[in-house]
Amino acid sequence: MVWQCVEAGLVDGRKIFVDSSLVDADASNNSVIDTRSLRVQLQEGYKKLEARLEEKSESTDSTRRYVKENRRYISTTDPDAAIVNRGRPKLSYQVHRAVDGRSEVITATEATPGDINEAHEMIPLLESHHLNTGIKANTVVADSKYGTVENFLACHDRGVEAHMPDLQESTAKRIEKLNIFPEERFEYDGESDTYRCPAGNRLKPRSLHKSRQSRDYAASQKVCAACQIRKQCTRNKSGRTIKRHLREEELDGMREASRSAKAKRDIKMRQHLMERSYARGTWYGFDRARWRGLWRVQIQEYLVSAVQNIQVLLRYGSYLKTSPSVMMEQIKRAMTRDIRSFLDYAELMSSKIVQSVLFRFIYRRLSFIEG
């Protein structure tokens, strides 16, 4: 369906808007258990279970992308759903979308458990957009949740402009409210590879963190302890530490571009565009999971996105020049082909129940066209 929108000239493809939204899981909070309370029972049968696992093949489900790690609370009804506490705790999934700005076609979408950090999904959406449209985006627009160091550098390496607020700036504003000097008050000297603090003291390079690709800069503890403005700088007994990324120059360039007037216009436009996309999705029940399990929620999101793209195609595309009966037949054939190919990929063609549920769902959603 995305490719049909591309062929109809409804997708520009060079600029995409990214955001996420929560989807209520089809499970009650009463189904949630505390895994710590089961630790005693699990330890009793651990040896027997370990013996069984050694006999099993190691590659039982190597294609599963999201693995529940150290999750304390799990729903017995829908283990893939996660508790998200935004206002009040709820079992949720999370839907991530990339939307093209020309006609608001959804070019890429992904469903994850609700506790997945949405910043981790930006680059996969960018790559899916390229795969689905055949067009490489040169600009990605998102909110501050996506403005991480990893995303800025990933966009830099791909030659993509990142129009999104820097997450560190949001943190700096919170620090300023505590009457603590932000990192911007510390001047970096490239020749000596040192920082100068607001009191005029030098912060020299200390430890190197290879995993974070950053280096710590700090003055001696004696210098910090004797500083007259220490209370405005830090409350740490060891003194103030500044972290500098090994690719700080590239990061500074990306951050500077994200503050441009063009970027600010795109960020403002993104808010309304993505709200419209998800608001239209509520007409087709995207905000409530009809089935349980991550792969089923993913299918639901594919279908809802397909219906929304069909609406765009009917409103602006070449289908408007076709008679209603021919138009409906073309859409049904296209949707049937797409769903069957997806079912083949998921190895679900043997399940007649799944096929019938999917076809009834999509045709019911398309019934408004015939009316």
Describe each model-derived feature in a short phrase.
Residues 1-371:
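Anion-binding and metal-coordination hotspots
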